Structures are given as structure tokens and as C-alpha cells.
Amino acid sequence: MIIETNHACDLVIFGAKGDLTKRKLLPALYKLEKSKKIHKYTRIIASGRADWSTEDYIEKIKTEVKNFLNEEINDLIWKNLSSRIFFCNIDVHEPLHFFRLKTILKQKKNIIVYYCAVPSNTLNSIFIGLGNAHLNSVPSRIVLEKPLGVCLKTSKKINDQISKYFLESQIFRIDHYLGKESILNLFALRFSNTCLFYNWNNKTIDHIQITVSEEVGIEDRWNYFNMMGQMKDMVQNHLLQILTILTMDQPKNISSESIQHEKVKILRSLNPINIHNINKKTVRGQYCSGVINEKKVPSYLEENGANKNSLTETFVAIKVDLNNKQWSGVPFYLRTGKRLAHKYSEIVVFFKKKPTNLFKNLNSELLQNKLIIRLEPNPNIIFDFSVKAPGLEQEYKIENSQLKSSQFSKKYSKNSIDAYERLLFEIMRGVQSLFVCRDEIEAAWKWIDPIIHAWKNSKNNAPQLYMSGTWGPKNSDLLLAHDGRVWYEFH
């Protein structure tokens, strides 16, 4: 059954020539057009400073869509999509230009969605321009990309600015990880399976590891990445989302308010990391040159436009503790980095060992049960457990076995939906459950800021170097070794 968006929308893209629009938004819109999920009267208004006609813009973006779509463009689908597109020449720093946009929008009675695919320092000009032109009334919606700001102070400033013109119910703050099928499955996995629901706590779980590993470097984004670093770009932005979904209490229902409420509670329960425990709780690194996929790659300081004295981290490993009844005493080890050995994202839940060993005659130590949740590539769920080794021996020889959800993996590869495809669909429907609220963002920054401050003010504040194509700095292993643990090996 085909479900299209409930109402016709005018999707206005600020930053229509930018990287996000070319790489993510337009390919996602093409796929939504292909699956007939866009209302037949929905329009796409691309805005930018270029003095282009609509025909100019459509001609230029077709090549870009081809590059990032990962499939051949179907002429009929492209014709249908491009017929929705209008180009509007706007300089967002010129408030009067927004009246040009108003002229186009007045032609229809569609619900207006403003997608801000622009840097954070441009946002307030957009808010002011829309407000002055009276283009901010309900039921219009506005979409902001995370991370919002670079710290708690700047994030609050942006939220204060937008709240002058838009209600919280109109604001959609995107973290694209929340549109990934494998991330959404964590809700179902946790809250629909009795065997996990009643064992998802500090009574049965020893510790949890979360890894988001990237093979790529900064991909010609020096100015942006050097300002953010891996902590702000990935931990604050994505890994904390995974952590909150893994640890939140069951919400009252699946409404955005209930889910966001439980996630905020987790973020506010994170034990602080500061100058007093920074070296025990965190490791940060920066990649050197090396070899990935048999290709030589440069160091971070050799990237295009690099500042040779930069101390920005490209790798973070961090031990996180929660101060609540359910998770007290269970450490969470997070790591993420660029130019690592393999690209993958994975959660590994280590269950506690049995206090007694019935089979100790032949097995000095029983193997630890593990639940491995592979997020990407090839999403899968694997359970590590112990069984009797086959044979005629009277004594029990215990060996490790794995239960793999092969059917789950096949379904995901066949029916996988791109994160932006899902999120754009939800935005046009007006559903906020996959988006982040103000309290959530500010609670995350409140925890992250002291870590950044401690790094800058510690005696040895330089990131540890690691060779591209490895698993990061050696101290990442020591972070777990101090607790008698090791990182789960990539398979």
C-alpha cells in the first residue's frame, strides 16, 4: 500500500546549492518520488543567492543527484520530481528578499516547510527574514540540522532566537541517526521482547560497548571539522542518541513528548567528566598518514587547508557512567574515529558471568554471553552463548556458539530506507517523534562542555597520534584494560 504525505507541502530549502542538499536531500526526495510518497501537489522551492532560473538549477542538480543516488536516474521519475522544483533567488541576509519567497508561497495554500541546510551562523538571518515577512505562522514548520551551535551557550542562543518566531511544535531538529532503520529497531528490540525487557539492567548486564568507526577522513571539510572535532561532531551528535535509546525507561507511549522526556532523563543522569577525572575517563587521538584499502592516505595535518598546529581530535574513546537505579555500576564504553581500520557501527552488550561454574572440571571459566547489535553495514543481531561440545565424553566440554538473525539481515538489506528519506517523509507528515527537542540538545551540551574544557586545560592536551588504518591510539585499549576488559573485535 502506498502512503503519501497527508497534506500538500511547499518544501523551501535554504542552502539549495550546498553539500547537504546535493548529497542527502535531493537523492532522498528522488526516492520518495519513486515510491509515490510525496503528495501530488507538493512543491520544492530551492533558494540561493545565484542569479539562476528554475531551468538553470534543475539542469545543474541533475548531475549532482546522479553522483550521489547510487542508482540510475529514471527519466519519468526525474521529470515528475523536477516539475515540482522552483528556484528563488534569495540572499538570507537581505530581509526584503523574503518577500520574493512570499510571492511564490502565496500561489498555493500548502503547508510550508523550511529546511535550513545552512551553517549555524546563518540561521538567525533566516528566522528574522521569515518573521518580518510573516511567513512563520502555524502550521508552517522549520527544520534545523544538528549539531546546533558549538557549545551550550551558542546552542541556547540559537534556540532563543528561533523561539521568537516559531513554537516548539513547529521546530524539527534533525539527527539523521534517528532516521536509520537499525537505530529505530532498538526501540522494538528493547520494548517488545520480554527476555530482554526484564534483563536490561545492572542486575544482569556487566557493561556495554558502542563503536561508530569510519574509514573516511574529513572529506575536504577542514574548516567545519576543525571547529567541531570528533567529540562535538559524533559523540554529542550521534553516540549520545544511541546511548539514550539503549538506556531510557519505557515511555508511556510512542509520542514525541514521551520519548523525548525519557531521553532527557538519561542525559541528566550522566556522571560528570571534568578536569579531575578526564584522563581516567577519556582518550582522544588524531590520525597520522597510513594505508586504508591498499591506498595511502594523508594525516589530519596534511589535509587540504590544514592548520599544521591543530590539536583537534579525530578519535574519541570515553567511559560513561549513569547515576540512576537501573544502570548504576554498569560502564558504557563509547568510541568513534576517522581513518580507522573498518567502517562499521555496533553495540555489544556483555552480560554478567554466572557466579558458580557447574562444569569447572573441563572448563576453568565459562564464556561471557554477549548480544551483538550490528547497526551498519549489513544490520544484524547476534547472540553469543554456550553449548555442550559434541562427543562421547562423560564430562561436559562447553564451547561458544552464535545465534544469528539471518532473516533480520535479509529483510533489512532488501527493505532498507535511507535516513533522510524517512525523516523528510515524517517532516512533511508533521510527525515529531524522530526528532530532538530543545531540552535534549541542551542537556547533551551541558555534559559535553566540561569535557572539552578539561581537554583544553589539562597539562598534556595534545591528542595521541594513531596511524590511519588502525583502531586508534593505544590508550584506547588501556581505558578498558584498567577495568579488566577489552574492546570487542570487529568480525
Swiss-Prot record:
List, from the UniProt record, the residues annotated as the active site of this protein.
238
Which key words are in the record? Carbohydrate metabolism, Glucose metabolism, NADP, Oxidoreductase
Annotated Gene Ontology cellular components are: cytosol
Positions with a binding annotation for substrate: 176, 180, 214, 233, 338, 343
Similarity remark = Belongs to the glucose-6-phosphate dehydrogenase family.
Q: Which NCBIfam families match?
A: zwf
Tell me the protein's name: Glucose-6-phosphate 1-dehydrogenase
